[in-house]
From Swiss-Prot:
Family statement drawn from the similarity comment of this UniProt entry: Belongs to the Nudix hydrolase family.
Function: Enzyme that can either act as an ADP-sugar pyrophosphatase in absence of diphosphate or catalyze the synthesis of ATP in presence of diphosphate. In absence of diphosphate, hydrolyzes with similar activities various modified nucleoside diphosphates such as ADP-ribose, ADP-mannose, ADP-glucose, 8-oxo-GDP and 8-oxo-dGDP. Can also hydrolyze other nucleotide sugars with low activity. In presence of diphosphate, mediates the synthesis of ATP in the nucleus by catalyzing the conversion of ADP-ribose to ATP and ribose 5-phosphate. Nuclear ATP synthesis takes place when dephosphorylated at Thr-45.
Domain of life: Eukaryota
Name of the protein this chain belongs to: ADP-sugar pyrophosphatase
Residue sites binding Mg(2+) 3 per the record: 112, 116, 163
InterPro entries referenced in this protein's UniProt entry, alphabetically: Nudix_hydrolase (IPR020476), NUDIX_hydrolase-like_dom_sf (IPR015797), NUDIX_hydrolase_CS (IPR020084), NUDIX_hydrolase_dom (IPR000086)
Motif (Nudix box): 97-118
Designated gene of the protein: NUDT5
PTM info: Phosphorylation at Thr-45 is required for homodimer stability; dephosphorylation results in destabilization of the homodimer. Dephosphorylation at Thr-45 promotes the ATP-synthesis activity.
Single GO cellular component term: nucleus
């Protein structure tokens, strides 16, 4: 990013935004040049992407972790596969979407889950607003965990709305290996949130890493 000569103000290490200049705006996103003060008192600029749809809610959208529970079956994580033009190919993701004006994150999560997968569930927990790619955008989401009763009649044959997505259910206890297999077979990309979740499951169930003894 561009930088300018240091100013005489703000030499105490505090960083803050000075100004934001609109460069280009489309229907869904806009590009801005953000001018800010770095810890040394130098004025710098940063190119930032922001959504045009943000309202008064605390986050732009929701990402749903749907846990499908059925009697005598392993728990499964319900994912969606869809074509993403910016990636130029297919991606595996959590069901997700923007929060409508006046809608709670929990309500948005249940709505998006049903629209994309056809499943109906119950909210187990909802995270605070968390950032997604802070080096590029100010976009934030609530991560909402939803449990799905697979024994319920309404979830026996879920009917998602036609959104050009494929619903994939993978065993929770083998999620990372199944994702790696799909990547190798279909040459798609896994969303970082999904892969991080799979890695966390693996690490949580694995033996602690051995720390080698130091030799003196």
């Amino acid at each position: 990013m561009e930088s300018q000569e240091p100013t005489e103000s703000s030499q105490n290490g505090k960083q803050y935004i000075i100004s934001e200049e609109l460069i280009s705006e489309g229907k869904w996103v806009k590009l801005e040049k953000t001018t800010y003060m770095d810890p040394t008192g130098k004025t710098r600029t940063w190119e930032s992407v922001k959504r045009t749809t943000r309202k008064e809610q605390t986050a732009d959208g929701v990402a749903v972790i749907p846990v499908l529970q059925r009697t005598l079956h392993y728990e499964c994580i319900v994912l969606v596969k869809q074509f993403r033009p910016p990636m130029g190919g297919y991606c595996i993701e959590f069901p997700a979407g923007l929060i409508d004006d006046g809608e709670t994150p929990e309500a948005a999560a249940l709505r998006e889950l049903e629209e994309e997968t056809g499943y109906k569930g119950d909210v187990a927990e909802c995270s605070p607003a968390v950032c997604m790619d802070p080096g590029l955008s100010n976009c934030t989401v609530h991560i909402v965990t939803v449990t799905i009763n697979g024994d319920d009649a309404e979830n026996a044959r879920p009917k998602p709305k036609p959104e050009f997505v494929e619903v994939i259910s993978l065993p929770k206890n083998d999620l990372l290996q199944r994702l790696d297999a799909l990547v190798a077979e279909e040459h798609l990309t896994v969303d970082a949130r999904v892969y991080s979740y799979a890695l966390a499951l693996k690490h949580a169930n694995a033996k602690p890493f051995e720390v080698p003894f130091l030799k003196f």
